Amino acid sequence: MAEVKDHFAGRIAENYDQSSAWMFAPEVVEPTVDFLAELAGDGAALELAIGTGRVALPLRQRGVRVAGIDLSTDMVAQLRKKPGAEDIEVTIGDSASAAVAGTFTLAYLVWNGIMNLTSQDAQVACFQNVARHLQPGGCFVVVVNMPDLQRLPRGEKFRPFHIGSTHLGFDEYDVANQGLVSHHYRLRDEGWKASSMPFRYVWPAELDLMAQLAGMRPRERWSDWTREPFTSESEKLVGVWEKRT
């Protein structure tokens, strides 16, 4: 399996909370934490790609014991600056292979984190790694955007996802290989700076099969944290898989 690259180092980590401020809003975070706390129950939770603690810190404040995995030492350094971070143990590594002490009633990977693993093998390995950490009956939650292929004109591979005065974003699709590269152009003091991040998009049925290979079964499938039904028009999947007993 290919080495996973840290795409969140340096300035990206330093500016992450500010550039993603809308994701930290109470109306976004609270339904997320409600959903996860319910599944965790009296047990502990493991967050894959814990980042700067957007979800882990408020979940810990709810009384859920939380551990985390993240590849980016710089993102974890930002987490460590925040109140309550001392209660969260973080292992540096990728979601497909990093090992954490103990077992958990809940593991979760939100905000397209599964897509940061850019091969099918790595995504399958992620499910298998989670299964090793879950107690029997424990749940794995994956949140991922649905591929926006319906809006991609035939023969085209680029689609803009954000046009602003200081940021331009374009997705580049490789439909044959389920590949996606997000290209960012950000206006800095020294001028426009370009960066790109690769992803591998996934479909719900494919995730179900990955879970099956890891000894899990589907439990819930929603379009958001408030348990709205998942349909063909849904832009996001909130999937829950349960480790077989």
Predicted features, each with a name:
Residues 124-136:
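A short glycine-rich, Lys/Arg-flanked "PGG" loop and its adjoining helix->strand segment in the class I
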Residues 1-51:
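Conserved class I S-adenosyl-L-methionine
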Residues 52-98:
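Class I SAM-dependent methyltransferase SAM/SAH-binding core
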Residues 206-245:
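C-terminal lobe and adjacent flexible extensions of AdoMet/dcAdoMet transferase-like proteins
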Residues 108-110:
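A conserved beta-strand element that flanks and buttresses the S-adenosyl-L-methionine
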Residues 141-210:
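SAM-dependent methyltransferase
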Residues 99-106:
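A short acidic, Gly/Pro-enriched loop at the edge of an enzyme's catalytic core
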